[in-house]
């Protein structure tokens, strides 16, 4: 029935109609079967592929995490070894420096002792030379004094004997 442009059906939109429910259910089951045949397989395989992809990504992430932890552990070990090696090198450098310093000090002491010894020897030689010169001068003075005293000139052999005798006398008196 048509009244003023509105179609009124028997019953309302919310009142149950068994025929409509039946055909709606049949249509739904048919669409469901068609979708199951045509779309369910691809949807499931797409979901399985997606699940495999996600699982693969998770596995790769775990593997990358494990590798990163291993690399971090190795880096820490290498850093510890490098620290130990640097400490060893520093310690060896200090020991070498100390040995070098001790060697230089020892060498300097030996050189100083050698220089002192050489200086003492040189002083002793100069002392001997000075004594020899002094003896010769004393001998000459003694000869000149003796010549003046006795007013005679002695020959060279006699003069040498007298000088040697005086030198021996002086040496024995000094020692």
Swiss-Prot record:
It is found in: Cell inner membrane. InterPro entries: ATP_synth_B-like_membr_sf, ATP_synth_b/b'su_bac/chlpt, ATP_synth_F0_bsu_bac, ATP_synthase_B_chain. The chain crosses the membrane at residues 14-34. Pfam families: ATP-synt_B. GO terms for molecular function: proton-transporting ATP synthase activity, rotational mechanism; proton-transporting ATPase activity, rotational mechanism. Signal peptide: none annotated. It is a single-pass membrane protein. Keywords: ATP synthesis, Cell inner membrane, Cell membrane, CF(0), Hydrogen ion transport, Ion transport, Membrane, Transmembrane, Transmembrane helix, Transport. One of its GO terms (cellular component) is proton-transporting ATP synthase complex. Disulfide bonds: none annotated. It comes from the Bacteria. F-type ATPases have 2 components, F(1) - the catalytic core - and F(0) - the membrane proton channel. F(1) has five subunits: alpha(3), beta(3), gamma(1), delta(1), epsilon(1). F(0) has four main subunits: a(1), b(2) and c(10-14). The alpha and beta chains form an alternating ring which encloses part of the gamma chain. F(1) is attached to F(0) by a central stalk formed by the gamma and epsilon chains, while a peripheral stalk is formed by the delta and b chains. F(1)F(0) ATP synthase produces ATP from ADP in the presence of a proton or sodium gradient. F-type ATPases consist of two structural domains, F(1) containing the extramembraneous catalytic core and F(0) containing the membrane proton channel, linked together by a central stalk and a peripheral stalk. During catalysis, ATP synthesis in the catalytic domain of F(1) is coupled via a rotary mechanism of the central stalk subunits to proton translocation. Component of the F(0) channel, it forms part of the peripheral stalk, linking F(1) to F(0). HAMAP family: ATP_synth_b_bprime (MF_01398). Belongs to the ATPase B chain family. This is ATP synthase subunit b.
């Amino acid at each position: 029935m048509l009244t003023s442009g509105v179609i009124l059906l028997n019953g309302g939109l919310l009142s149950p109609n068994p025929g409509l429910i039946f055909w709606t259910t049949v249509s739904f089951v048919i669409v469901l079967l068609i979708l199951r045949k045509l779309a369910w397989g691809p949807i499931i395989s797409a979901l399985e592929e997606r699940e495999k992809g996600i699982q693969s990504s998770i596995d790769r992430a775990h593997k990358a995490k494990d590798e990163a932890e291993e690399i971090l552990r190795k880096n820490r070990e290498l850093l510890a070894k490098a620290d130990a090696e640097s400490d060893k090198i520093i310690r060896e450098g200090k020991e070498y420096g100390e040995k070098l310093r001790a060697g230089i000090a020892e060498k300097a002491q030996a050189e100083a002792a050698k220089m002192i010894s050489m200086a003492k020897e040189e002083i002793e030689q100069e002392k001997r030379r000075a004594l020899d010169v002094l003896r010769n001068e004393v001998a000459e003075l003694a000869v000149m004094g003796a010549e003046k005293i006795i007013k005679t000139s002695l020959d060279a052999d006699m003069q040498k004997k007298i000088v040697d005798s005086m030198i021996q006398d002086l040496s024995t008196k000094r020692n």
